[in-house]
């Protein structure tokens, strides 16, 4: 579940955001396995010394998610904030991003099955706060590596560029091809005949 611009206070266990995330996760768990919780949040807390209470609030949040989802050992992987913050656009006010990152690192060092993924060398969209498409892919690779190795990723991976290239060059699955075909039709960029030809 995503909620842009939310502070950690908006994710308290009584909040709508928390309850919605738990509800969606439980729905998915009806025919899927929960293997990790990924957390990327903090830009809204990267100012006005809010970092001072971040560790405590994150601890309550992690324990609440694990308890509600019935797995006290599920890996919790936190994404660090990018070093492009504090400079432009909507990210300009997030001048304490590095202090949030320090709290995240401290948290994963002190708690079981918690891992950190660096936001270093990721790049924003023109809005100055959200990471661009290629950076999202790099971040995803880092999250996966943290999950796969059960360890924190504190530096960008050496071979990220090649991994991203492989993602772009790989052949689409049939499900992806079907989605693209239907999307093109919906956007008026292909005909019904082309859709029917593909579906045969």
State where each predicted segment sits.
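Cell-envelope and extracellular/periplasmic
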Residues: 1-200
């Amino acid at each position: 579940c995503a909620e842009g611009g939310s502070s950690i206070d908006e994710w308290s266990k009584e909040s709508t955001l928390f309850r919605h995330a738990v509800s969606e996760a439980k729905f998915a768990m009806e025919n899927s396995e929960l293997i990790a919780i990924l957390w990327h949040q903090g830009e809204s807390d990267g100012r006005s010394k809010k970092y001072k209470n971040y560790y405590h609030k994150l601890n309550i949040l992690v324990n609440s998610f694990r308890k509600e989802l019935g797995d006290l050992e599920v890996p919790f992987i936190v994404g660090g904030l990018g070093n492009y913050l504090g400079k432009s656009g909507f990210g300009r006010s997030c001048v304490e991003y590095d202090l949030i990152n320090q709290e995240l690192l401290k948290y994963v060092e002190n708690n079981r099955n918690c891992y950190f993924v660096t936001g270093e060398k990721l790049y924003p969209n023109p809005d100055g706060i959200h990471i661009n498409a290629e950076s999202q892919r790099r971040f995803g690779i880092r999250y996966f590596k943290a999950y796969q190795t059960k360890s924190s990723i504190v530096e960008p991976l050496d071979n990220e560029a090649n991994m991203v290239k492989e993602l772009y060059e790989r052949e689409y699955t049939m499900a992806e091809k079907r989605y693209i075909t239907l999307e093109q039709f919906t956007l008026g960029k292909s005909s019904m005949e082309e859709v029917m030809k593909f579906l045969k």
